[in-house]
Structures are given as C-alpha cells and as structure tokens.
Regions:
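Aromatic pocket-lining residues of Rossmann-like dinucleotide-binding sites
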Residues: 23
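Substrate-binding pocket helix/loop in short-chain dehydrogenase/reductase
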Residues: 94-95, 102-105
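Conserved NAD(P)H cofactor-binding loop of Rossmann-fold oxidoreductase domains
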Residues: 86-91
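Conserved glycine-rich Rossmann-like NAD(P)H-binding loop of the short-chain dehydrogenase/reductase
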Residues: 26-42
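Conserved glycine-rich cofactor-binding loop
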Residues: 12-14
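The beta1-alpha1 cofactor-binding region of Rossmann-like NAD(H)/NADP(H)-dependent oxidoreductases
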Residues: 56-67, 100
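Conserved hydrophobic beta-strands of the Rossmann-like cofactor-binding core
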Residues: 5-8, 80-84
Length: 116
C-alpha cells in the first residue's frame, strides 16, 4: 500500500508548518504550498522525501492550476486523503483603521483563496 498523502496550503510558518510536521511524523506524505523557492528548499531539507513543495500564491489562479496539474500527475492513480486550506494572513489593528485595499487582500487570501 502506498503512503497516505495530504495537501496543506501555507506551510512556511505557524499553524501550517506545525500541521506539516504533525502529519509527516504520523507517516503521511505532505504536499505543501509555499510562496517562494527559498521556503520550498528549506522545508525540503528538513522533511526530505516526506514533503513535496508546491510554489504558488492562493490569490493567483494560474499558479493554482499549474499546481493541480502537477498534483494529478504526481499522485498517478491515488488520491489525496485530505486538503487543509490553511493559507491566510491577519492584518492587526482595529477594522476601523484598516485601509480598504488591505482588508480586500485579507479577504482574497483567507476566503477566496480557500474557494479557488
């Protein structure tokens, strides 16, 4: 039987990184999204063959489509056991003082990114 695989968005730091670590320690292969090659290399060195980095931004549909094509090809005839939509940002401070563009960016990443 092949190793169980999951996909987690936003694994560079924080909750995503902790989730990546948890699943690798429990015998899973994790496909994880990062936004740059530096993070991809750093995490690949740590998690080796248990981790496949996917470089994309959840707000960029073309990048997402490329990642999906790669995943389908890499998984061959198996499926992902789970998808963890973790990628997100938090803009600190009262909503009253946020710029509209910053609020829209937060919604685009946290809400629309999970939908895409």
């Amino acid at each position: 039987m092949s190793k169980k695989s999951i996909m987690i968005t936003g694994v560079s730091t924080g909750i995503g990184l902790g989730t990546l670590s948890y699943f690798v320690k429990n015998g899973f292969h994790v496909y994880g999204s990062v936004r740059n090659s530096k993070d991809a290399s750093r995490l690949k060195k740590i998690y080796k063959d248990n981790f496949t980095p996917l470089i994309f931004d959840v707000t960029k549909e073309a990048q997402l489509k490329k990642a999906v094509v790669f995943l389908k090809k890499d998984l061959k005839n198996s499926n992902l056991l789970a998808l963890v939509n973790n990628a997100g940002v938090a803009i600190s401070g009262p909503l009253l003082h946020q710029k509209v563009k910053d609020f829209e960016k937060q919604i685009d990443i946290n809400l629309n990114g999970a939908f895409r």
